[in-house]
Design a protein with these regions (language model features):
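Bacterial Sec-dependent N-terminal signal peptides
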Residues: 1-21, 30
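Generic low-polarity alpha-helical segments
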Residues: 1-3, 13, 135, 205-208, ...
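Long, contiguous juxta-domain segments that are non-catalytic but functionally important
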Residues: 7-9, 210-233
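C-terminal "post-core" interaction segments
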Residues: 20-37, 206, 228-475
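N-terminal start-of-chain detector that recognizes signal peptides
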Residues: 106-112, 116-119, 128-130, 219-224, ...
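A short, sequence-level motif marking secondary-structure junctions
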Residues: 149-151, 219-221, 437-441
């Protein structure tokens, strides 16, 4: 029998910053992570196919031997992991950023500037003619004070932050003024790298291209709504427009700030939505995220109880720690004692069940009911295609249980049977492995999403889907 004998502790001790990696070791580490943490392991590898899997792994390991190029290594690893036929289980390759001049073997040097909230407020009171870009700005993770350090050079100093990698008095952004234009340097949240961007000040909004900050003081006469501004600039933001008395929603993704942006659109167009009898919900190309983004529309969609299947989690020491650090740690640190107690109890239960597939509810599914659903819309066309995957598929499964909804388009991509993904680092800084922690319990009924994707109720031609959907709604 083919065996891998390099200890994981040795792998983890190797230099994690190498740009030319030892692919043999990365393979062994990835294989061990999958076998010990992947939620689909017990479904995918059985006594019947185990010899085939062992032979496959031995063959791929022999092909990988001697590979030192990161990119080639990542492709070879992806080829190996394709055995599991799970698009959520995959290798992630991050090409080194070309604008990074800092040696990867050294930590990125972060500037500091001693400045408290009181000192910042005092600075702006005493500065008679501050530069337009100077001020105190807010962001979901930071409060920053942008002050002039010397002519045409500004620091955005952290006054407070919820990001554990940063602390007050560290400089999050540097900005250089050239004439009437600004050029800024943005330091990543994990302090691993930096990038340069054109910077614009639009009334009270500091547009840093990849992040937006809202000016709190000094006061600005014209104030833009930050969420509306984000929607106008964010290609992945949800959108809503009306055509031929049809409300047309587009959800490119359920990631990023989509939840807040969707809530904003629902409130802004509330009256119009409640009086529009035909809707289109366009999920083509939706690559997932949090299905609850779209679930905010449930009062409009609902007609009868909705069955929502639960999941069971593969609980391991590594998965539990990664889950908490990835999804809960920041929220936990900002929570009050009451919420912390609830989280502590759940984490304790998870740790008590290490080595098991764990379903906290002990129920295969739950039934969702809505007491006062809206009358309108009366008809909903929900559009999907081969690029609708993950949480986009989950939302489709829930929404199509409504009598209002007809799913149109083409088969979805099929990537939902195993989810709640964790991203593990490998010894190679450019390669990570994405491992699903959860197994959906509809699998036990013999139903699978991943095999063929979700089938629409009505197949449509690829071109002009919106027009086709409108025509069918009007019939």
């Amino acid at each position: 029998m083919f065996k891998f004998i390099l200890p994981l502790c040795l792998i983890l001790s190797l230099n994690s910053f190498a740009q030319n990696c030892n692919c043999d070791s990365v393979f062994i580490q990835s294989k061990q992570l999958v076998e010990e943490n992947y939620a689909g392991w017990f479904d995918k590898i059985t006594e019947k196919n185990r010899p085939d899997y062992i032979n496959w792994s031995e063959k791929k390991f022999n092909e990988i031997k001697g590979v030192t190029n990161d990119s080639i290594c990542a492709k070879q690893l992806q080829n190996w992991i394709s055995y599991f036929n799970d698009k959520h289980l995959r290798i992630l390759f991050t090409k080194p950023k070309s604008n990074t001049t800092q040696s990867k073997t050294n930590a990125l040097k972060i500037l500091t500037h001693n400045l408290s909230v009181d000192e910042a407020n005092d600075y702006f009171k005493k500065t008679k003619s501050p530069d337009p870009i100077e001020g105190i700005y807010s962001h979901p993770s930071y409060q920053l004070a942008i002050t002039k350090i010397k002519p045409n050079l500004f620091y955005a100093t952290i006054l407070s932050t919820t990001n554990e990698n940063w602390k007050p008095n560290e400089v999050k952004l540097t900005i250089i003024k050239k004439g009437k234009e600004y050029l800024g340097t943005f330091y990543d949240g994990d302090k691993s790298d930096f990038s340069t961007h054109k910077v614009k000040l639009e009334d009270n909004i500091l547009d840093f291209d990849i992040a937006f900050f809202e000016k709190q003081s000094p006061n600005v006469k014209n104030k833009l709504d930050l969420t509306e501004y984000e929607i106008s600039k964010d290609k992945d933001a949800p959108s809503l427009h009306f055509k031929e008395n049809v409300a047309i929603w587009k959800f490119p993704t359920f990631y990023s700030n989509s939840e807040e942006q969707t809530a904003y659109l629902l409130e802004k167009y509330k009256v119009q939505l409640e009086n529009t009898s035909e809707w289109i919900i366009d999920l083509r190309g939706n690559d997932g995220g949090d299905y609850r983004v779209g679930w905010q529309l449930i009062n409009y969609i609902y007609t009868k109880p909705i069955i929502k299947y639960n999941a069971e989690s593969r609980l391991t020491k590594q998965n539990n720690e990664m889950w908490f650090n990835s999804f809960m740690k920041s929220y936990y640190e900002q929570s009050d004692d009451k919420i912390k107690k609830v989280i502590d109890e759940e984490v304790a239960k998870m740790n008590q069940n290490i080595g098991k597939m764990y379903n906290g509810s002990n129920l295969p599914f739950e039934t969702i009911t809505i007491n006062k659903p809206f009358i309108n819309p009366k008809k909903i066309a929900l559009l999907i295609d081969e690029n609708t995957v993950s949480s986009g598929e989950l939302f489709t499964m829930l929404a199509r249980q409504s009598d209002k909804v007809v799913v149109m388009g083409n088969n979805s991509g099929g990537m939902m049977d195993y989810g709640n993904i964790l991203r593990y680092k490998t010894q190679c800084s450019t390669i990570r492995i994405q491992v699903p922690m959860d197994r959906m319990l509809w699998i036990d009924t013999g139903f699978f999403v991943d095999k063929e994707g979700l089938k629409p109720d009505v197949y449509l031609q690829v071109n002009n889907l919106i027009e086709q959907a409108i025509d069918r709604l009007k019939k």
